[in-house]
Amino acid sequence: MALLCLALPFTLLMGTAYAASPLLRRGSRGADVKQLQGNLIYLGYLNDVADGIFGAKTEAAVRRYQSRNGLAADGIVGAQTRAKLTKEVLLLNQILDTARSYLGLAYQSGGTSPQTGFDCSGFTQYVFARAGISIPRVSRDQASAGVAVPYSQLRPGDLVCFNSPVSHVGIYLGGGKFIHSPKPGDRVKITELKYMDLTAIRRFTGVLVG
């Protein structure tokens, strides 16, 4: 199975310049369009390259995003679409940035905070809580919370669950890698997903499935 490699760098550029840009629609070109495309790729709505040209694929992705988020699905990126998209991207960035900030923290069985150290599910629960998202405490319960996501739609910020029954969890970062607090004697670290027995994917933000 090949993982979708997501365009993470685009999300780091979204700021006031993007927020203040004019309407974007089919036929628009330039840096704002490229930024928009990068964020749609990041959120799983666009399976294409970010080339700065607002064509049919970008329009379809925008319509899909709007429809899924209770907006008028006109394919035009105005203030409402831009604001909702920005909020979702910033939320995902917050989750990933928080997770990365604990790289190197020692594993602690039963640990649920930076002060004590984390076990695997204590780590994921704490990271999501910092973004205002409440998830269960233990890995097997986390694996049945949120919304199930197929492997083909895996994106950054998703909870990745391992083994059967589920006994380990982490947070997907993109590019085939995830962050987790692995085991006693180890530390919070980034690991390639291909080395793990992935059995479930759950999503708690900006649900897009099917």
Name each model feature, range by range.
Residues 1-49, 88-93:
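Acidic, Ser/Thr/Pro/Gly-enriched interdomain connector segments
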Residues 19-28, 68, 79-104, 204-210:
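Intrinsically disordered, low-complexity Ser/Thr-rich linker and spacer segments
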Residues 23-34, 38-83, 136, 172:
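Short acidic, glycine/serine/threonine-rich helix-capping segments at coil-helix boundaries
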Residues 33, 37, 59, 82, ...:
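Extracytoplasmic/secreted envelope proteins and their assembly/folding machinery
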Residues 75-77, 153-154, 166:
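Short glycine/proline-centered loop/turn elements that form peptide/ligand docking sites
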Residues 103-156:
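Catalytic cysteine-centered active-site loop
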Residues 133, 139-149, 166, 173-210:
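Aromatic- and glycine-rich peptidoglycan recognition patches
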Residues 159-161, 179:
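Hydrophobic beta-strand signal
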